[in-house]
Regions:
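ANL superfamily adenylate-forming
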Residues: 3-8, 12, 16, 100-148, ...
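Conserved pre-ATP/AMP-binding loop-to-beta segment of ANL
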Residues: 136-156, 163, 186-192
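Conserved AMP-binding/adenylate-forming core of the ANL superfamily
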Residues: 1-52, 56-60, 77-82, 131, ...
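Conserved ATP-binding/catalytic segment of the ANL
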Residues: 342-347, 351-410
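Structural core segment of the AMP-binding/adenylate-forming
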Residues: 36-37, 64-132
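Gly/Ser/Thr-rich phosphate-binding loop
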Residues: 213, 238-243, 252-320, 333
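Conserved AMP-binding A3 loop
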Residues: 17-21, 145, 152-176
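Conserved AMP-binding/adenylation subdomain of ANL enzymes
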Residues: 175-192, 200-240, 254-255, 260
Length: 410
């Protein structure tokens, strides 16, 4: 019930707009379609879509049935899609026009016992038309009991070697992500949140969950160019913007080179620049404040295994600690441990471990990998860190080498 949409008249998207009320109706229609097609609580529905107006209603339609939502990375090859469909035991796959070629390549193999729904114009012959099938479904919420400890979603890790791992989360985990986001940034129904990253990623949706919880306006943006971002902030009166480091760097470069002029945009309402998904250079924030001196700043640390961002965050009043990832977030605990799992002394380097309602249930169908990272409710992150004298956590290294590009491990 905490996910009820608070103000049905408030718009939810950029350019193509829908209200929260229509959003909810769309989610209900898809939920009822799934139920008509035999989807039961605990079964899985995959989402292979670019950011679009349909993405989030589809996601919540799945959750309303008690089934599990399984978002897939839009960069996956046909073989990777097939691997994820089979590992997660997906019963229905929803995909968009950008993926026709990849899905068609494996359709004969993955369609055995599975349904394929296509979102968009020109439905291919090997799939069924999402719009046509949902149009006549009931817009009433299905009467399915969903509990906090019920499985809710499977996310796939970025994966540093081989194929990605499947990460299982329950409904409590998703709900806590919404509460943490709202708590960390003081979001109200008057805030307008600009969501730019791909929605298959835990980070994008979990930040957006703050808007869902408050009934505030959310702006879903497809482009990442500096001009597109500033136009969206100006025209939609965005107050909170979540950026990745490359996007912030590109925006500053465009301002430095006089390609853009902030005087051309209405940006006075923009109160918070939120950045994360990879280490943030202090020099970037110093540079940012030259153009936006009144902005609050926050950074979040998180993993897909901790339902994305929020298990550690800097806090909007701690800009003097730029370079740190912060302290344990709302409802979370954090500690730094040695090889034996014992807490190290402040100032010493060890592995960061976190504990809270957003820790994954397990790596789906991989008990060995689960046992390596979950210990008495603590998630061992694989990130090496240390605390300063004030208890702020700084990342030092990875236990294993990894390259981060655009907020993702590769």
């Amino acid at each position: 019930k905490e996910f009820d949409l608070i103000e049905p008249s408030r718009a939810a998207y950029y350019r193509r707009e829908i209200t929260w009320n229509v959003f909810n109706e769309k989610a209900n229609r898809f939920a009822n379609l799934l139920i008509e097609r035999g989807i039961k609580k605990g079964e899985k529905v995959g989402i292979l879509l670019m950011n679009c107006l349909e993405w989030l209603p589809i996601y919540f339609g799945i959750l309303k049935t008690g089934a599990l939502a399984v978002p897939l990375n839009f960069r996956y090859s046909a073989d990777e899609i097939k691997y994820c469909v089979e590992l997660a035991e997906i019963d229905i796959l929803v995909f968009g026009p950008e993926f026709i070629g990849r899905v068609e390549e494996i359709a004969d193999e993955i369609s055995k016992g599975r349904l394929l729904y296509f979102v968009g114009d020109g439905c291919p012959g090997f799939a069924e038309d999402y719009n046509a099938h949902t149009a006549n479904c009931s817009s009433q919420s299905p009467k399915i009991d969903v509990n906090d400890d019920d499985d809710a979603a499977i996310y796939f890790s970025s994966g540093t070697t081989g194929f990605p791992k499947a990460i299982l989360h329950n409904h409590e985990s998703l709900m806590h992500a919404a509460k943490a986001e709202q708590n960390h940034h003081g979001q109200t129904k008057d805030d307008v949140f600009l969501c730019i990253p791909p929605l298959y990623h835990t980070g994008a949706k979990m930040h957006w969950f703050g808007s869902l919880l408050t009934g505030g306006k959310a702006v879903l943006l497809k482009g990442t160019s500096p001009k597109t971002i500033l136009q969206a902030v100006s025209e939609e009166h965005c107050t909170i913007v979540w950026l990745l480091v490359p996007w912030a760097q590109d925006l500053l470069l465009a301002l430095d080179n006089k390609e853009l002029d902030i005087a051309d945009y209405d940006l006075d309402q923009w109160r918070l620049m939120h950045i994360g998904a990879q280490p943030v250079p202090p020099s970037l924030i110093k540079h940012w404040k030259e153009y936006f001196p009144n902005h609050k700043y926050d950074t979040n640390y998180g993993l897909s295994e901790s339902i994305g961002p929020g298990c550690v965050h800097l806090g909007v009043n701690n800009i003097d600690k730029v370079g740190a990832i912060g302290k344990a977030g709302y409802g979370w605990e954090a500690k730094i441990i040695d090889e034996q799992g014992e807490t190290v002394k402040r100032g010493e380097t060890g592995e960061l471990a976190v504990k809270g309602p957003g820790v994954m249930t397990c790596y789906y169908r991989d008990p060995k990998a689960t046992a390596e990272v979950l210990h008495d409710g603590w998630l061992y992150t694989g990130d090496m860190a240390k605390e300063d004298e004030d208890g702020f956590i700084f990342l030092v290294d990875r236990k294993k080498d990894v390259i981060i590009s655009g907020g993702e491990n590769i």
